Amino acid sequence: MSAQPVDIQVFGRSLRVNCPPEQQDALNMAAEDLSQRLQDLKVRTRVNNTEQLVFIAALNVCHELAQERLKTRDYASNMEQRIRMLQQTIEQALLEQGRISDRQDTQFE
């Protein structure tokens, strides 16, 4: 479906943005999250300039995103290592099983 204009409220300001209908709930939640972040920053930093608050919030979000990407990369690397170890364990077990089967076959001849 194509994006449709949607009115949202962010930090007391009305914004009209285009959004696919199936993503409107996520957009509203994001707008609420941003509003809360801006309000928290305003209280914590005592900065009243909305533009400055928006830049600080954007930097914080970018930092959080970078941290999550790093965590995801580390997790994927860890999983790849575990999969390789599991594959090696399985291959070793199959080789040993094959050796045992070969020994048993020669005993019955």
Swiss-Prot record:
Keywords for the protein's UniProt record, in alphabetical order: Cell cycle, Cell division, Coiled coil, Cytoplasm, Septation
Task: Set out the biological process GO terms recorded for this chain's protein.
Answer: division septum assembly; FtsZ-dependent cytokinesis; septin ring assembly
Q: Which residues form a coiled coil?
A: 22-99
Location(s), subcellular:
Cytoplasm
Instruction: Enumerate the InterPro entries for this protein.
Output: Cell_div_ZapA-like, Cell_div_ZapA-like_sf, Cell_div_ZapA_eubact, Cell_div_ZapA_N
Task: Note the superkingdom of the native organism.
Answer: Bacteria
Question: Its GO CC terms?
Answer: cell division site; cell septum; cytosol; plasma membrane
Q: Does the keyword Cell inner membrane apply?
A: no
Assembly information from the UniProt record = Homodimer. Interacts with FtsZ.
Q: Which family, according to the similarity comment?
A: Belongs to the ZapA family. Type 1 subfamily.
Q: What does this protein do?
A: Activator of cell division through the inhibition of FtsZ GTPase activity, therefore promoting FtsZ assembly into bundles of protofilaments necessary for the formation of the division Z ring. It is recruited early at mid-cell but it is not essential for cell division.
Q: Specify the protein name.
A: Cell division protein ZapA
**What organism does this protein naturally occur in?**
Yersinia pestis
Whichever gene encodes this chain, its name is: zapA
